[in-house]
């Protein structure tokens, strides 16, 4: 067994020490990726089963580590309630983490699947086969559960992963990572298959973005706008961009009001700090007289601040005026911007101008309007008569997700095990030569 990685402390030759540390862990991860690429599904599933057990049996230690992280965050005056919510683990959330590992274990192994096969006129058979990406670098901020989600999804898809969690969740991630390593060890897989960067030093992020001399094949950022922007600007390897969720719910004139109220309330208030939370409510002008006031009152009475245009402000004195920035803001809090638009075309135009290509929903009983919305809104996830909070890999049946990719290349939407694979072509011949 290789010696454990040593954390970088102090200031003496810090950059040199950190570079050596990162180069070492990258080399170990690359070696582990070669082993994982050939690991049979049964061995990977044994590791996942052991990880699930370890999370449950070490729940108290995970929660204790998280309590220290949360206490430190609360002592900082600039941490919002939504940030604290994303950072906080509860017994139910730890159990959900374990259950997610079990679900990932139960899904089909994507590696080695022949997605397409055909025979050429010369008798050669060509197969397109799923293969792992290699080494995935995951850079995330406050959510400690990302360590588990990313670790198990990369394992399932035959990839090694280097995890760099936020400094705010450092202790929590370390406790979770120990459980994942225990599972790898019990299954006889290399411990470097899931590596946690053992330092809070922010310079480690820049080193990962450099690709660590070709050791990292793809970067997945999970965090706020500034993190994602930095990754996209500095990364020298491909990026699965997880942009902010400026998500919209459009209530069409044909919408059932009871359904609309239920969807809007859930989309905004179920958990305000998740990337699938609705941030803007759009209401068809033709429904304003009947639907707007009930929707606004419902949100305010649920504890949500509503910032509206002139029409919305007239429905309730408690509505605050919206400014131009509100239409582009991911609040991650109990705040929503609200606007009246001219039908589905007006909603689509607003989303095109202000959306983040993440998740947008229409509430409508008009199939033509719904079809138009689903076709023309250029977001990774578009929903008809359902809450935006279904923007989640677990809800898609992926077991978990490594992020919601909002770009257009390779992966889009929830990134599960299958999306963490590429492909190669296998060609079978009987001695053919090209004329």
UniProtKB/Swiss-Prot annotation:
Organism: Bradyrhizobium diazoefficiens (strain JCM 10833 / BCRC 13528 / IAM 13628 / NBRC 14792 / USDA 110)
Highest taxon of the lineage: Bacteria
GO biological process, one term: L-proline biosynthetic process
Compartment(s) where it occurs, according to its Swiss-Prot or TrEMBL record: Cytoplasm
Gene Ontology CC annotations of this record: cytoplasm
Molecular functions per Gene Ontology: glutamate-5-semialdehyde dehydrogenase activity; NADP binding
Family matches, as Pfam families: Aldedh (PF00171)
Pathway: Amino-acid biosynthesis; L-proline biosynthesis; L-glutamate 5-semialdehyde from L-glutamate: step 2/2
Protein's gene: proA
Physiological role: Catalyzes the NADPH-dependent reduction of L-glutamate 5-phosphate into L-glutamate 5-semialdehyde and phosphate. The product spontaneously undergoes cyclization to form 1-pyrroline-5-carboxylate.
Endoplasmic reticulum in keyword set: no
Key words, A-Z: Amino-acid biosynthesis, Cytoplasm, NADP, Oxidoreductase, Proline biosynthesis
Protein name: Gamma-glutamyl phosphate reductase
Location, primary (coarse class): cytoplasm
